[in-house]
């Protein structure tokens, strides 16, 4: 072999092993682990210590298994072209239905309690409008009965005087009882008006409320005289009814047999036994159908009006309070079985002499809690005491919060809400300042100054029924005569008069279809997607994987911190050893640098050959050690053969 070829063969032999040219599998695997970009395999080879090497083997094999699993799922999903469609019909639970008469109590049962209030109300109406109310025989009797007290001082008008202001001049007002003008020193608070307005648009009607010492007063005005008088009447009405026991109020209201004339559900007859009494402070006796306190929850398997709830209600217009309510009919609210029916807030009114059809669509919503939204899954994270015997809702929280503020600031509870534990309802005798306190607190609540709106949260899961209401005249002119005659005969035990169509109302509640709409919130970025996105970015830009991240943690955190700690430990040990060692005399300093006359700093640094020819420093002695035996040096095995072929013999 030529000398050049021999040299090339020697160099090639000593170069790193490449792939298939490796002499055996062990060296091939060693070469792969040292040169691959798969960091885990490299860490298996270069790691020192059996435990660390074993951990890297475990991490790498786990990562390989996960890669095969994920790739198999992706390939299987790619080649799957079939689709699966499920059509599922099921029975839907029928909601609870609460029905109330708009008039809470029979007028004949409560007129003796409200006689003085009605007398002063009629006097105020006569002063404002200049007319006296013409009523039926029963109401004329009540009016003549209350006129006996004509010579007495007005009780309710003194507590909260009704006044009429001229627009633009709030310093003087006309008193409703005396008809005279008087000076008013009070804050004017204007309440939003409804539809009706007084005949003289130049006047604004309101009533005055003062604190105990009458030093602080406020006048609440309405641009509608009807609204002002009804609000004033309602305020005193709540004060009177708050002093009546619950048992007496239930007896003064309508029974289930009186309110419900006929009942059908899902084509099957029902009666008052299928309804549960619910007494509302402002609506009297209400009755709830399909309440689970009675029996199991009813369900329906078909949509349409024939498979829902059908009832005929007896309204009894003659027993209506003329000042408390100005319309006739009933209120109905659809809700869950464990939910409190807020009749005054979300109730639907039912007209008399009409058939009201309510079609329902069920929507079930599920929201994500913190940190995605400010909703609550239960009452645990809301610092408000639940005064309702029902599950959590935003309305329950707001009303409970206001009632708690009412008890805290006014010393009593507001009549239209449930009574908190240990509190009493407000009334004049025990709490003479409650009216003024209530209105002041209500204004602060509307302006969101009580903090209730910030504390209360929406519920994360709830059911909602979307209602579609339609009306039809009922009964028709051709069927009115025979239908009313039969209903009068059927209800002769409960109703002692002949029925007319203005006393009745028909109600139909049903599912329009059995499709349930579900709205569910899911995180837009889950933890799996987050890890996938981060891994994709690391792999794209840095060729890094989970194993690479573990390697970085090992090198830059574990090993680096260990080295720093070891260095600091040795440094501290050296400092402590020097401190404890005895002081030694300092050796004379040898001439170096510019002190050495043999060194010229302007010249270039000497090479190894030129350094041997430099003269020794002054005063230095050449050591007497004999020169080394150069033939005893041993070179690396990898270069021994090369030196044999290429070395040149120099003469000694």
UniProtKB/Swiss-Prot annotation:
The family this protein is said to belong to: Belongs to the amiloride-sensitive sodium channel (TC 1.A.6) family. SCNN1G subfamily.
GO molecular function, one term: ligand-gated sodium channel activity
GO BP annotations listed: sodium ion transmembrane transport
Residues under site feature: Cleavage: 140-141, 183-184
Membrane topology category: Multi-pass membrane protein
Chain positions of motif PY motif: 626-630
Subunit structure: Component of the heterotrimeric epithelial sodium channel (ENaC) composed of an alpha/SCNN1A, a beta/SCNN1B and a gamma/SCNN1G subunit. An additional delta/SCNN1D subunit can replace the alpha/SCNN1A subunit to form an alternative channel with specific properties. Interacts with WWP1 (via WW domains). Interacts with WWP2 (via WW domains); inhibits the channel. Interacts with the full-length immature form of PCSK9 (pro-PCSK9); inhibits ENaC by promoting its proteasomal degradation.
Described purpose of this protein according to its UniProt entry: This is one of the three pore-forming subunits of the heterotrimeric epithelial sodium channel (ENaC), a critical regulator of sodium balance and fluid homeostasis. ENaC operates in epithelial tissues, where it mediates the electrodiffusion of sodium ions from extracellular fluid through the apical membrane of cells, with water following osmotically. It plays a key role in maintaining sodium homeostasis through electrogenic sodium reabsorption in the kidneys. Additionally, ENaC is essential for airway surface liquid homeostasis, which is crucial for proper mucus clearance.
Disulfide bonding pattern of the chain: 100-286, 210-217, 263-270, 375-460, 397-456, 401-452, 410-437, 412-426
Major subcellular site: membrane
Keyword set, alphabetical order: Cell membrane, Disulfide bond, Glycoprotein, Ion channel, Ion transport, Membrane, Phosphoprotein, Sodium, Sodium channel, Sodium transport, Transmembrane, Transmembrane helix, Transport, Ubl conjugation
Cellular-component GO terms for this entry: apical plasma membrane; plasma membrane; sodium channel complex
Protein's gene: SCNN1G
Organism: Bos taurus (Bovine)
Activity: how regulated: Originally identified and characterized by its inhibition by the diuretic drug amiloride.
Catalytic activity: Na(+)(in) = Na(+)(out)
Cellular localisation: Apical cell membrane
Superkingdom, natural source: Eukaryota
Gene3D superfamilies: Acid-sensing ion channels like domains, YojJ-like
InterPro entries in the cross-refs: ENaC, ENaC_chordates, ENaC_CS
Protein name: Epithelial sodium channel subunit gamma
